[in-house]
Amino acid sequence: MPLVNYTEDPLHVLHPKDGAAGTDRPKALLDAVEEDPDPLLKLAAAHVVSSQQFSRDELLQLFRLAAQYETTPALMHLPLAGKILISAFYEPSTRTRLSFESAWHRLGGAVMSITDPKSTGIAKGESLADIAEMFNNYGDVLVLRSSDGEAAHNMLENLRIPLVNAGNGIDEHPTQALADVYTLAKWRPELFTGQVAPESRIKVGIIGVPSRMRTVRSLLRMLSLFPDAIDEVVIISREDENFDPGQREELEEAGLSLRLVHELDPLLPELDVVYINAIAWVGDTFEAMGEGLKLDRDSPLKKDAVILHPLARGDELSTDLDDSPHNWYFAQARGAVFVRMALLTTVVRRISAVMDTPEN
């Protein structure tokens, strides 16, 4: 490995590989979306379990606040000081857990972290209802990840603090969808503000299985709030059964145009956005899906297409794309911190500390 002269280039290690860094794009998003605190006030003290529960206006204001955090470090004047986040991850995680904990720390709060269910009362057979009662006494927000698709729902009845679902089995991952769509909103803000001409709408390709992958399920539901921005969503999958009963109908009734194909490369020249995932969590392990559906530097991508990936990746996404302009997946991971900061600020009723317009 060649040596780097840090005297000549002291910020060398801070140079991101992708081309989506900097503040120009979040600033453009700020310019495109007028501040309105009212939609966010509706989320105060709310549980966040599904991407289905958000409105279009709520998303736009969350994205605007995230862009403020991303462009204005001075805005982070510790609005969550004195607040405690319970970070309960009963399923393996690196990015999501650290992203939430980073978001909370940046806002001045303290974190209590659980990363091994064997170290909790669950290992002794304690019920989720009793655990929820204990969480009420220890923290101000619970971020929960579990391989049990019903865990988040089962805790709600006994929780008096907001719960944020960080992934529940194969069901949903709503804050990953927030990070995904926030990335697209920075890429092309006009798509999400109703200012896009029909001929400028985008075609999105999603490599994954909507019925088995929580990231894909949540993303599709969130995209369905912006059908006027999307010409078509193409699901690329080798599976025979890709949708749960009623899932496709729900999305099409919301206005999304859906198509299913089995081969990737013939479609790539048409796609403006390529979203790729190959992991579906099942129980305490995962299934690798989509064998043969891979992206690398030789893939026939559209010149200005962007690639998104929720990470962690395997060989479905080659590292030789990391230095290409198609790489928006690192920006996606960076932006996840800011959009989670926006969401957490909202659910703990601290909007008045960071928005120009005070709460009512």
Question: What feature does the model see in each segment?
Answer:
Residues 51-79, 170-199:
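Short N-terminal or domain-adjacent regulatory/targeting segments
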Residues 2-98, 358:
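Positively charged, low-complexity intrinsically disordered leader regions
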Residues 78-185, 314-319:
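Phosphate/diphosphate ligand-binding glycine-rich loop within oxidoreductases
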Residues 304-305, 310-360:
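Adenosine-phosphate binding glycine-rich loop
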Residues 90-103, 186-276:
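Glycine-rich phosphate/diphosphate-binding loop of Rossmann-like nucleotide-binding domains
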Residues 161, 228-231, 299-306:
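A short helix->loop->beta-strand "cap" motif at the edges of active sites that frequently abuts
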Residues 251-327:
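Rossmann-like adenosine-cofactor binding region
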